[in-house]
Amino acid sequence: MQFRIEHDTMGEIKVDDSQYWGAQTQRSLENFKIGTEKMPKELIGAFAKLKRSLAVVNHKLGKLSLEKSQAIIKACDCILKGELCGEFPLAIWQTGSGTQTNMNLNEVIANKATEILGGNFREKKLIHPNDDVNMSQSSNDTFPTAMHVVSVLEITHKLLPSLENLLKTFKEKSQQFKEIVKIGRTHLQDATPLTLGQEFSGYASMLEHSKQQILESLEHLRELAIGGTAVGTGLNAHKELSEKVAEELSQFSGVKFISAPNKFHALTSHDAIAYAHGAFKALAANLMKIANDIRWLASGPRCGLGELNIPENEPGSSIMPGKVNPTQCEAMTMVAVQVMGNDTAIGIAASQGNFELNVFKPVIIYNFLQSLRLLSDSMESFNIHCASGIEPNKEKIDYYLHHSLMLVTALNPHVGYENAAKIAKNAHKKGISLKESALELKLLSAEDFDQFVVPEKMIGPKA
């Protein structure tokens, strides 16, 4: 391996000559050999979009030459095309402001831009990482800006489409199953009837609510900290910078961003991300409930509830031949647990905004993006490999429906609650049907029982 000598304000340091990064990135690599968690590539992409927009705006404001602006823009485009993906090796366990990652971007962009201008960054840097790429910026405002940019983009382009696909499937299943009457269950005990379609409509409504909660959380995530520089005052930044960068980012990404109205808030608090992740946690709770319901309803095949048949995707046991497990449901529930854990970490980290700056930014955005990615991927997987293939086991559903003692509820208006309870308890004690019990107790005639106890008429309120 060949090395070159790079320098920063702390002196000289050896850097792998094949890499574009510089001294500060190298120091971070050597000083923070902690864990395996690296800065997410999605965050690096958002940072590149931000640096690109800043190069455009700094030129428009007369602070950066056209030549340097265009070189920086082209270097950022190289990052966005994936041409420099091996240049961002830093761990999330670094300074809590994300300074090392900001400088990682600055150094790589500066050296690539120098090459674009025809120079050799190993000999002389035509673009300076601080003076040019980081012009009018601080890590304290660029990192939280990149956090919000990546959050909005990933929610818009990854999470919401996956959620919408699963929601669509449950809406379709709700219609497909609307004529299938089944027994309901509360407290894990038999309850009154409903249709399988009604049950699935509940799942669809849960996901619709989650979608709306996530959409609502987007509004404050659109607010960008850029222009606040070190402590929120905007020192060394043009007064029009923040508004113009938000406009440029919006135009370039095709997604709306605005300048945060209070930069002191934007630097020291991450309540917008904590709030958005709260919506993720609510979605995870809904997905956990749905996946659990489906695997219980599909339990069996001979000794469980068995009301649903789910796709058989792979062998389920290394010792029991022919066993097939609800693997997609299990994967979904594990994702939900991880998201709930991430929510706790984000909540604690977001509370640590001491004075003018929160210094838990990397761990906040790492966990946020992990939750987003896991939710998106698991919903897509669950939809394709499980939800879309769910079918009712009508024989089992009908058996449970007509053997449930809770059909006695339909008799309340005719014989009263206490007499209805006597019918149910007598039937359960003697192992006979509700009809047989009612006749034995001489509370109803056979004709009246058949008229009053009709499961298909018990699935909605009466006129």
Swiss-Prot record:
Keyword vocabulary terms for this entry: Cytoplasm, Lyase, Tricarboxylic acid cycle
Cross-referenced SUPFAM superfamilies: L-aspartase-like (SSF48557)
Record: active site: 187, 317
Catalytic function, reaction form: (S)-malate = fumarate + H2O
Pathway involvement of the protein, from the record: Carbohydrate metabolism; tricarboxylic acid cycle; (S)-malate from fumarate: step 1/1
Biological process annotations from GO: fumarate metabolic process; malate metabolic process; tricarboxylic acid cycle
Pfam families in the cross-refs: FumaraseC_C, Lyase_1
Subcellular location per the Swiss-Prot or TrEMBL entry: Cytoplasm
Residues with site note (Important for catalytic activity): 330
Chain positions recorded as substrate binding sites: 97-99, 128-131, 138-140, 186, 318, 323-325
One GO MF term: fumarate hydratase activity
GO cellular component, one term: cytoplasm
Coiled-coil regions listed in the entry: none
Additional observations: There are 2 substrate-binding sites: the catalytic A site, and the non-catalytic B site that may play a role in the transfer of substrate or product between the active site and the solvent. Alternatively, the B site may bind allosteric effectors.
Complex formation: Homotetramer.
Family as reported in the entry's similarity comment: Belongs to the class-II fumarase/aspartase family. Fumarase subfamily.
Function of the protein: Involved in the TCA cycle. Catalyzes the stereospecific interconversion of fumarate to L-malate.
Alphabetical list of PANTHER family matching this protein: ASPARTATEAMMONIA/ARGININOSUCCINATE/ADENYLOSUCCINATE LYASE (PTHR11444), FUMARATE HYDRATASE, MITOCHONDRIAL (PTHR11444:SF1)
Name this polypeptide is given: Fumarate hydratase class II
Source organism of this protein record: Helicobacter pylori (strain J99 / ATCC 700824)
High-level lineage: Bacteria, Pseudomonadati, Campylobacterota, Epsilonproteobacteria, Campylobacterales
Gene assigned in the entry: fumC
